[in-house]
Amino acid sequence: MAVKEYTGLSEIRGPIVVVENVSGVRYDEVVELILENGEKRTGRVIIAGENVAIIQVFEGTEEMDIEGTRVRFLGKPLEVSLSPDLLGRTLDGLGKPRDNLGEIVPEKTVDINGSPINPSAREYPRNFIQTGISSIDVLMTLIRGQKLPIFAGNGLPYNRLAVQIARQAKVTTEEEFAVVFAAIGLRKDDANFIVRSLEESGAIKNMVVVLNLASDSVAERIATPRVALTIAEYLAFDLGMHVLVILNDMTNYCEALRELSNYRGEVPGRKGYPGYLYSDLASIYERAGIIKGRSGSITQIPILTMPNDDITHPIPDLTGYITEGQIVMSRSLFGKGIYPPIDILSSLSRLMKDGIGEGYTREDHPDVASQLFSAYSRVMEVRSIASIVGEEDLPEIDKLYLKFGEEFEHLFINQSFDEERSIEQSLDLAWKILSILPETELTRINREYIKKYYKASDET
């Protein structure tokens, strides 16, 4: 399609500009805006009318003059350059190098919006991805092709958890594995911590970091997760790699979506978010999966901060409808000094049942996970009773459950930022803690596994 150029804008509204008396303009078309001083900025068409185009400008509209700005419609959608050389690189939210290591010679360029996976071509997710974190690997196992979000509150260490997962994640087979880390609207100190941690550990060699700072434009923020997923699709379905995509923080993405919606003058929905928030999030989350006949996979961990710790807020609420489980971070565990402070009873992985056990992790894994959930639930009940009657008046079995709860939180859930545990180490640790309880309490575990792994402690 031919390039069309116009001079002058009709209106500037925040990161939005309006151009009138145009023709043949398409929705999602890339636009080049040339300021009077020769500076070039990039935008895309978000509304294409009969003779008007509304454009969101990725670099912002500061110092842009209404009369002197030239607008070029390039006749193509926003694309990202793809190459195996992307591994080890840090890019901006539009997929351009940010690490001063030179330009990337593209093998191909692809529209960042991708295309949805045909449901009939999807393969059911199986096989697990080891994160090296006991509570996740044993109790809410991440499965290849799954989308498993992390719900956190402000002030909780979700950035540390994201970095630890990115650094330690691996597949237990000999297949190739990579991580795409999209930092969306993060403060500079958080972004520096993430990049520095990944570089110092050497993990960045098998990663692509797509970095959008809080100081970058909200328009670029909308593109960031799509750029990251387009890169992931190339690594997975062209190069045959298993790819884990970490999207941190999707709340910042949704705030940017709300801001742009307000600039457009759209009718707001719940809490001011646009009515299409659900379908917009689905267009991102549903790019995870496995395609029949292809060797790669895309697994997603979207991370989002819940305003006021409200899990019913539209962002976590709608995310929960689209994804396959959730990992919830606990403020009370964080207050006890436990890291990662994962709320076990509020978290689950809906696909773990099909990717654990014999042939995947270890034969006792499903039973151990079920027993840990059951026992920890009993711990919560006993703690409630103890807060009323006191621990001294509890029966001996309840005192054992209290001891189990303390050991479970401080030895199993709690692990240091630099500690990586294999699935075997995590399961062995689970058995050690379960052995605090009498054998008769392990009602959810096959007798064969009890004989093999159970070792009664002195308390029992």
From Swiss-Prot:
The portions of this protein that span the membrane are none
What Pfam families has UniProt attached to this entry? ATP-synt_ab (PF00006), ATP-synt_ab_N (PF02874), ATP-synt_VA_C (PF22919)
A Gene Ontology BP annotation from the UniProt entry:
proton motive force-driven plasma membrane ATP synthesis
GO molecular-function term, one example from the UniProt record: ATP binding
Instruction: Specify whether NADP is a keyword of the entry.
Output: no
- What UniProt keywords are attached to this protein's entry? ATP synthesis, Hydrogen ion transport, Ion transport, Transport
What family classification does the UniProt entry report for this protein? Belongs to the ATPase alpha/beta chains family.
Q: HAMAP family, per this entry?
A: ATP_synth_B_arch
What does the function comment of this entry state? Produces ATP from ADP in the presence of a proton gradient across the membrane. The V-type beta chain is a regulatory subunit.
Please state what the protein is called.
Answer: V-type ATP synthase beta chain
Taxonomic classification, please? Bacteria, Thermotogati, Thermotogota, Thermotogae, Thermotogales
